[in-house]
Amino acid sequence: MDSPSPPSIGSAARWRHRLDYLAAFVFLLCAGYIAVLVWVDHGNGTFSRLSEVWQSMALAIVPVSITYLFRYWRWHWLLRRKGHHVPVLPGLAGYLAGFALTATPGKAGELMRIRYFARMGIPAERTLGVFIFERASDLLVILSLSLLAASVFPTLGTLVALVLGFVCVLFGAAAWPALLNSLSRVSERLPGRWLRRLARFGLISALELRSCLDLRAFGQSMFTGFVAWGLTSAVFVSLCAGMGLQLNPMVALGIYPLAMLIGALSFVPGGVGTTELAIVLMLNRLGISTPDAIAVAVAARLVTLWYAIVVGAAAMLIAEFASREEAG
């Protein structure tokens, strides 16, 4: 398949319009989450239980923040090996800015990184290719860690088959030139200029993904993923210990990744609600009371998902301010 020129990303005004919609979606999601928490608190004492572990939650921010640095290092390394010079701090701000919209459907809001990395001379399809590779390798890491909690989720085998099947199809399609050539011919016959351009962009991204499918890139990505998700799992275990819950540490290490996997497969934006429910049900199977399980689930999500959104929003403001300074 020939490599056509990259499609236009759209004007700045269009980007701002889309970002406004995505930001409004995340804001409404946050408001709904708070409303549900207030409702759940009646009879469960969730807030009072959270107040008992606020110190553990504050300390948890440190390892969670370290995971962001590891993830950015992977992103920076993947782009650098493709010949791009990414300034460390502006690149970090652009990468973290994607977390502001991580609670959008399929984490698609994280693709706003295209906006910031395009300013550094990185084509949109390359950013998308790295994003897909990062997500796919993280999926394999999460799946591996989830096996530690197999005893509390009898149907894990089905999830394993689904995830492995998806990743194999994704990587197989990217690595199979004949399939991409066939898809390229089909895309040229699609009705509508917009649909053809979208399909063309997707195929170029698949070509970019193919360039990531070497042993060194896969090994580096998996190593970084295991460090990042291992730290996140350890944070969950520490929160359980802080609440005095007696759990097998090895099983507890697998609960949060497995809950994240279930949340992702639920197709609920950010896995909000479904991830928490999965944590509660798994802890219930281990003999933990529902009020305690709810408190742990909420605490874990506050220091992971919602903390990431706050960090992302701050990084987005920094990135936007920096771009205006350059324009001025």
Kindly give the residue locations of the regions a language model identified:
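Transmembrane alpha-helix interface/packing and boundary motifs in multi-pass membrane proteins
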Residues: A97-G106, A241, P257-E276
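Selective transmembrane-helix segments that form parts of the transport pathway or gating/packing helices
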Residues: R135-L140, R301-L305
